[in-house]
Amino acid sequence: MSIHISAKQGDIADKILLPGDPLRAKFIAENFLEDAVCFNEVRNMFGYTGTYKGERVSVMGTGMGMPSISIYARELIVDYGVKKLIRVGTAGSLNENVHVRELVLAQAAATNSNIIRNDWPQYDFPQIANFNLLDKAYHIAKNFGMTTHVGNVLSSDVFYSNYFEKNIELGKWGVKAVEMEAAALYYLAAQHQVDALAIMTISDSLVNPDEDTTAEERQNTFTDMMKVGLETLIAD
């Protein structure tokens, strides 16, 4: 057991999908994994291990925001030996060419958080994806015929931001979308020398306000990113 995860050693696979929403973790386990067993219910942050196409994989919720994903990802890496971590979550488009239900693969993650500068006050440490996972995910998504964007995202500490116009301006600099976790995940992966990738589905748009989705859709659909994430985890 770790502080926030009740699993025993061996309960968690060395490769894992990390949705923010624990109910999305439950959905993935019930709809994509065979012989899924729940290994965590602490704080209702559900985690499951099963098999996907014969490969042992896990899925677990992380909650919202960088502090929350930092807790769960660190314990998964340090206490349970997880080596591949793929975030599957939602994001808001910052770019007029990136639309609702399309995929974004976060090649890198800018951030307005001080979570990394607490460790490196003299540096702007770049948070980047593992290239092998990124490359595999891109080709898997394209082979599925999914509209997929690759590039920088913004990991924000604030959902209801007072810097709306600044965030929009980032879209003009090539930033694809805004979300709340990728930078912290990539930083932990660099710190512990494991592989990480963030795959997001666009759930709404800051530049095309007529594009949005319901809370139920966000929980129970968006299966494209789940398929890409699972296929990427088991790819040779």
From Swiss-Prot:
Biological process GO terms, please? purine nucleoside catabolic process
Protein name as catalogued = Purine nucleoside phosphorylase DeoD-type
Q: Where does phosphate bind?
A: 20, 24, 43, 87-90
Q: Which HAMAP family match?
A: Pur_nucleosid_phosp
Which residues does the annotation say bind a purine D-ribonucleoside?
Answer: 4, 179-181, 203-204
A Pfam match is: PNP_UDP_1
Which organism was this protein described from?
A: Streptococcus thermophilus (strain ATCC BAA-491 / LMD-9)
GN (gene name): deoD
Q: Which residue ranges run through the membrane?
A: none
Q: What is its EC number?
A: 2.4.2.1
UniProtKB keywords:
Glycosyltransferase, Transferase
Q: What task does this protein carry out?
A: Catalyzes the reversible phosphorolytic breakdown of the N-glycosidic bond in the beta-(deoxy)ribonucleoside molecules, with the formation of the corresponding free purine bases and pentose-1-phosphate.
